[in-house]
A protein has these predicted regions:
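Acidic/glycine-rich phosphate/pyrophosphate-binding loops and surrounding catalytic core
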Residues: 1-213, 218, 227-235, 241-243, ...
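Short secondary-structure boundary segments
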Residues: 222-223, 246, 268-269
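Cys/His-rich Zn2+-binding cysteine-cluster or related metal-binding knuckle/ribbon modules and their
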Residues: 250
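Short, charged, intrinsically disordered terminal tails
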Residues: 268-284
Length: 284
């Protein structure tokens, strides 16, 4: 896990504990002795790319610092029904409290990683990279971004703070591409910030405007056809990175990649996923 992610992950775990356990797991408190210890296993029930084992361990350790965590496979492994990701031993009350929290996290992260791997596979043999977006569940973005990386994809910006991305609304409100880029450069210089600049374009003519304004780090081709994309890549001619976005599906993305774009951003990696089936069960 990246060092900068840890505070977000810790905060998410605390929130998950508050919303699920509240003032106590009364079911376990009333029928499980306080000193009772046991062992459970994380059983995979569906084929896919597993993700979130590292987070599951943090959840368990937060609820029981004495927990014994025996990991058997790594995040990013393709699992099949019957595979065991890890065994965990500790206070039974703590294990039962952690069960749903860690399953919710792992099932979603594994769903994102599995879906990402499908998109990455579609571009096999090409240099184009698959990017995620900011279309994530509020509060879950760090985990979604981690899962995309585990599935073989790449991360776009984390939020509004680590990259300037001039989209259509910014450009329209600023009065056009040239004044928008000029405003960005003036602002970043005044603030002493060194972050990448990306600009969305809606036509081939817009590309000329970007370079007339001094250029950017990356140009995003918004809702271009493959034919337009090929012409756009030729016009950019390697002067900056290129990205295709908008309306690109699993079925059409290779057509765009074959035009030579560096990146394709896909919102479906995180907002149209199916969680991977798994369970945490008692064992000897």
């Amino acid at each position: 896990m990246k060092t900068e992610y840890k505070p977000y992950v810790d905060a998410l775990i605390e929130l998950a504990i508050r919303e699920d356990i509240g003032d106590g797991d009364h079911t376990s408190l009333c029928c499980i002795p306080a000193d009772e210890r046991g062992r459970m296993r994380l059983l995979c029930k569906q084929e896919g790319i597993i993700a979130g084992i590292e987070i599951a361990r943090l959840v368990l350790e937060r609820l029981d610092p004495t927990v014994e965590f025996d990991q058997r496979i790594a995040d990013g492994t393709r699992v099949r029904p019957g595979d065991v990701a890890f065994y965990v031993a500790g206070s039974l009350r703590s294990l039962l409290q952690a069960e749903r929290i860690l399953l919710n996290i792992m099932q979603r992260m594994s769903g994102v990683a599995t879906q990402t791997a499908v998109y990455v596979k579609r571009l096999e043999g090409l240099h184009t990279k698959v990017l995620d977006t900011r279309k994530t569940t509020p509060g879950m973005r760090v985990l979604d971004k981690m899962a995309v990386k585990i599935g073989g994809g790449e991360n776009h910006r984390m939020g509004l703070f680590d990259m300037v991305l001039l989209k259509d609304n910014h450009i329209d409100f600023a009065g056009g591409i040239r004044p928008a880029i000029a405003g960005v450069r003036e602002y970043l210089a005044a603030k002493g910030k060194n972050i990448p600049i990306e600009c969305e374009v809606r036509s081939l003519e817009d590309i000329d405007e970007v370079f007339a304004a001094g250029g950017v780090d990356r140009i995003m081709f918004d809702n271009f056809t493959p034919e337009m994309t090929r012409k756009a890549v030729e016009k950019v001619a390697g002067r900056c990175e290129t990205e295709s976005s908008g309306g690109i599906t699993l079925e059409t993305m290779r057509d765009y990649a074959e035009c030579g774009v560096d990146f394709i951003s896909v919102g479906a990696l995180t907002h149209q996923i199916k969680s991977l089936d798994m369970s945490l069960k008692a064992c000897e």
